[in-house]
Amino acid sequence: MSAICYNTAMQKPEILAPAGNPTALEAALQSGADAVYLGLDAFNMRARSSANFTREGLADASRRCRERGAKLYLTLNSIIFQGELAAAEEMLAFAKPHIDAAIIADWGVAAICRRLSIPFHISTQMSCSNSEAALFMKAQGASRVVLARECTLAEVEEIVRTAGIETECFVHGAQCVAESGRCLLSHDAYGCSANRGECHQPCRRRFLVKAIDRFADADGNPIHDADAEFEVTPHTVLSAKDLCSLPFIDKLMAAGISSFKIEGRARTAEYVRTVVSAYREAVDAVMDGSFTPALADRLVEKTKNVFHREFSVGLYFGRPGADQFTDAEDSSARQVKRQVGVVIDYFLKAGMAQVKIQDQPISLGDTIQVQGPTTGVHEFAVTSLRRDEEILETAERGTWATLPAPRCRVGDRVFRIDPAPSHPRSLSASRTSSMASLV
């Protein structure tokens, strides 16, 4: 199929990648991210998780980004209470030399950013869903707005055309069932507020439906039987599919969006590597005129190898229907990684890694990954295995082996990549639809 041609004056959007740890950060930069966003230990929407950086790590992340010509944004986008203003200001003052902007969701934090002369972006949590809101936010000093996920493509185009401010839109990753992510379910069920970075993701779980009304027989006797309670299984009823915009990335670029945001600070380094590289290739192909539906299909298939909960087009082409919700209880990834061991030496001239096999064995022909905070993520096939002068077919647990490998470091973790167990579909075909039919 022939390539799709576009105006050569089209703006090339920034690819904004998530980083929950130094390995993911390195993977993002290696894969072509133009910018990275991360959080510290408080005041962000992943504050509950381990997917955050230390203050020392922030300085190192800033150095790495600047060496690669990439920007770095700090997420400080949770609700801030009165007693936390001083701590939030102290965090921003510390971060100022290391970041290009802060992503915020509180007008008090906006005031602090203005006082400290820190550029700030309005988080999607603030539901900027129209041009008047964008103009107001611009007037308050915002340099960018992350548009509400509820915006359709037509609405995005109109906001971009009329607001005169940088716009950022999510293009890939998890979607919250709540309006702009402002969910109260976790707080109601567990006392942990998603709006404070403490989401327990109850929407991803299965549910029981219990009949409250009591029924009686013809003689007026109460009926108490097991049918009064129903298990909604194996389906999920609130779990949204992941967004994937690769099939219509050209349309998003034509809309003039400034930055394409990939969700996933709590996801793995190989997820970041795979997804960022897919969007890098897609955006570059649109710019040079080589983008085709066949290329989009290939890139979608590539992203299916890593964590996702099936894919949908989000709300870009209309309000959500039943087909926007997943029937998968966990990841639908086509591949899984299994711990093999660690790198215990690397011979630079020979391009050989010495690996201690602590868990799963590796054999000739296996695909493995090496991951580390400086190495990032390398994935490659095992083409030879040796132990001293002995040529091996398999390196078993409790042994060691040397093998050809890209540059890696002592302490890097080694994984074997296997096909994932199949995920049986548990909902009827009427609940699913192809992405292609919607775009």
For each predicted feature, which ranges?
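Surface-exposed amphipathic alpha-helical tracts and adjacent flexible/coil segments at the periphery
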Residues: 6-31, 35-47, 59-62, 68-83, ...
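Short glycine-enriched loops at secondary-structure junctions
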Residues: 21, 78, 105-109, 126-128
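Short coil/turn segments at secondary-structure boundaries
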Residues: 49-52, 79-86, 101
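Aromatic-lined substrate-binding rim segments of carbohydrate-active enzymes
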Residues: 52-56, 65
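Well-ordered mid-protein domain cores that form the structural environment of catalytic cofactors
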Residues: 86-123
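Conserved nucleotide-cofactor-binding alpha/beta core module
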Residues: 130-132
